[in-house]
């Protein structure tokens, strides 16, 4: 680990910045700020408008797009309101630029100093490609809300969100490979359960994106049952014609799936912990499992509260941030059962 300390710090710094970016992205979504910047320029958008005249010009450009014409024009939407939503989208993109610099500049330095072995270099090249693709996905998502509908595609939003989580998890995995270079005997049953758990968490993140994109957290604000005391609410059937659409495009169906997967995630983590009692575990493995139990309980509780209180900004942001911590802990635990 000592020989790779600077590389490890670099990778973990990247993880932290991705975490911050996704939290800010959550605020951007929950404050309806994501469509405030109607174009994308790598250099000229680095700073927000610096004069009142430039603000007026940018605001007038925003007025040409569906979100203003179909929604905000009816809400006495002022330049001051616009500056608020512009800030969050600008800040989200600004952090993305910082992440790019934080990755590329040290990467070049490590290349020159030959601090990256062939395997780590290959993994970092993959990370570079993932970062570039994530930037494309961000604009691809925003573009969907600038044409006809004054909202982004929930499919594109979920793709953008989920890929950020995956990029974070892979960056953490690369760092863990350097922190724990030694090999040990793999406990196959526990590793396989941990893999399934990680996959289900990724699926839950996808549906979390669907819920956010469709504003599906604003309906059926009851727990443990949906509205009218129903486990499977009739609106799931009525909203869409096909079963696929009901569970990918219908608000009630998407929320039902998100609710249901939460039970599977919690159950798998409890099952993994129970199965681990039959094996001799390392300290890192025990710590990972104990942390998972605590975090999944907190996240489950946050999810219920977010639903019951109709997604207040602060709860929605904390719920998304805790999903990151749950993913990080699952990734760490899987790594400790895999290497």
UniProtKB/Swiss-Prot annotation:
GO molecular function: metal ion binding; oxidoreductase activity, acting on NAD(P)H, heme protein as acceptor
Binding site for heme: 258, 319
Signal peptide: none
EC number: 1.17.99.9
Entry annotated with the keyword Transferase: no
Catalyzed reaction equations: Fe(II)-heme o + 2 A + H2O = Fe(II)-heme a + 2 AH2
Keyword Zinc-finger: no
GO (cellular component) term, any one: plasma membrane
The family this protein is said to belong to: Belongs to the COX15/CtaA family. Type 2 subfamily.
Subunit description: Interacts with CtaB.
Protein name stated in the entry: Heme A synthase
